[in-house]
Amino acid sequence: MSSGLKFGKGHPYDVIVCGAGHAGCEAALASARLGANTLMLTGNLDTIAQMSCNPAIGGQAKGHMVREIDALGGEMAINADTTAIQFRLLNASKGPAVQAPRAQCDKKAYQYRMKHVLELQKNLDLFQAMVQGLIYEGGKVVGVRTNLEVEFYAKTVVVTTGTFLRGLMHVGKNINKGGRMGDFSAEGLSGSFLEAGIELERLKTGTPARILGSSIDFSQLEEQKGDIDPTLFAFYDTRGIDNVFHVEQSERNVRNSEHELFHVEHPHQRKLGWLPGQDQVSCWMTYTGADTRQVVTDNLHLSPMYSGQIEGTGPRYCPSIEDKFVRFADKERHMLFLEPEGRNTNEWYINGLSTSLPFGVQLDMLRSI
């Protein structure tokens, strides 16, 4: 943190970052670590780096990017290594060109640690406010205006709003404004872009319902354990940030180790009481069945994706369950992964079952698996 917030035109920052998700955190840290006086603005300081969808880092076409961020001095790799509850190297039986490290993280531990890193970073201020608009002078962005009419000025403004920019949430025919469930969307900022003549397009992403761990019959599922010899994301750490989180895994997950615990730690870290000495947590695999297909296909007309209600373009390699049954009609079943959201929660994420179907249909679909 710096010595104090800089308000008004007479006290500009070098850089202002709007948003505190994965991109915003890396942008703010990169700026501050290069010596620039930086301000990060977010609507809620308690949801910095919140893993809104799957609490995992890396995987196919993503694991290499995490390592590239690390090589450039970023924090994501270290944050994942120190808060992971399971490590897996995907495509381990194939060549290194297609291998991909992946870590299932503790959703809250990841969020809390990243916030702590930001709070300790020199040259970086954090402020809770919704950015309502950009301030232009002479055709150039020179600052931002918040929902409280507070103005901050800077030489550079970085916008990392993610799903919050005029976000809409669809559950069947039900539509609500929001960046994610429980959080407001950023409405005013879109108007600033339009005023500047910047064209806006709408993108789409989806997420599955979370389920209660105690409701799962694990005897019907295939267990997926973490790797015995974990492949980590971070190459090294020379940042020397004090009092950052620490993870230990028990010896049963370390190959040929003479040590009692496997340590993922960095200089001057303190230990967290809920992590030391605990094993990696298993994920579980299952499939959709004929009943699942029936429920989805019988209700396609209720899906916002197929009724024309959703106009945005979705991610190519993360199709919804509706898309899977339509685009891959020849497949009788689709693979699903049940993944824990953390050590201290009973919530589980169903990887492969993202949907925008109505609540009742989602319930029938879940009960069919």
Regions found by a protein language model. Give the residues of each.
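Short beta-strand elements
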Residues: 156-162, 327-329, 334-342
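Short hydrophobic core segments
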Residues: 16-18, 151-162
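Core mixed alpha/beta domains of very large multi-subunit molecular machines
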Residues: 310-332, 339, 356, 367
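Intrinsic disorder/low-complexity segments
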Residues: 1-8, 240-269
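Terminal amphipathic helices with adjacent charged low-complexity linkers/tails
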Residues: 208-221, 320-333, 345
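Conserved N-terminal/central alpha/beta ligand/cofactor-binding core
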Residues: 12, 29-137, 148, 160-180, ...
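Beta1/beta-strand and adjacent pyrophosphate-binding region of the FAD-binding site
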Residues: 10-23
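Flavin-binding catalytic cores
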Residues: 191-201, 288-310, 337-339, 353-369
